Amino acid sequence: MHYLDEGPVGGEAVVCLHGQPTWSYLYRKMVPVLVKAGYRVIVPDLVGFGRSDKPTKRSNHSVQRHIGWIVELIEQLDLQNITFFGQDWGGLIGLCAVVDTPDRFARVVAANTGLPVGVPEAMNDFAHQYYDSIPLVNANEMAINLVKNENGLGFLYWVKWCAETPDLDVPFVVRSSVMHGLTEGEQKAYAAPFPDENYKAAPRQFPSNVPIMSDNPAVPLFKEAWKFFEAFKKPFICIFGDSDPVTAGRDNEFIRRIPGAQTQKHQQLKGVGHFLQEDAG
């Protein structure tokens, strides 16, 4: 696993985790600010992304395995008193790492992320049938249906597109999820970790790992995480973009259910999309 380790070794640790399909490059605007403030900033590339190794089988990229890799890194670096910042899948994986090593974390910042536990069991068969019935559409149609969110299952268009599209266009994914656009150089940077199809197992698999169906293997992990965070009294702060249709409302769930969130000031950033690190730095 590749990771950035910037700032003074004795500084208070900040661990920043990216999601799918980005990498540590996403934090290039934030890292210098944190380092200047005296923090030691650790920014891993999740396995399968960035400069980390890229196992070629989608089955290698289970949620549990990715949590384990992050926990192993934190323990090897012996990080203590961590401020965790997680966005997208970085949030889901990192929050579970907090559950597994709670004494190492001092506070949490959740950014455009969540802990979904699937549709109600009574709706599970319908969700599976809906997924089977939807066509594989082009990227633009996928984005439209994702936002439209018919039956509350629009995310399944995203799942199918990532799993089956002949060309998983990573720059398109990032570009279409920010409000302020990307330069040609930035788009090339997001494409660089994936020179051909053999490198894309992780970004293809991650959407399928999101618990939409109640029988998804990650459901027990995230339910256990909710039990933990419903008793979590350390500071828990939400920073969400107001123009992200994917995670809209997830901040309210965190604030309502987590004791440590109820005494904090939270931010909803105006004109900011899913990848708020790009839109708001």
Model feature map: region roles:
Residues V272-G281:
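Catalytic histidine-centered segment of alpha/beta-hydrolase-like enzymes
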Residues G11-H18:
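Short beta-strand element of the alpha/beta-hydrolase
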Residues M1, E6, A13, L26, ...:
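Flexible "cap/lid" subdomain of the alpha/beta-hydrolase fold that forms the substrate-access gate
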Residues G19, D88, E278-D279:
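Conserved acidic functional residues
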Residues V33-P55:
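Conserved alpha/beta-hydrolase
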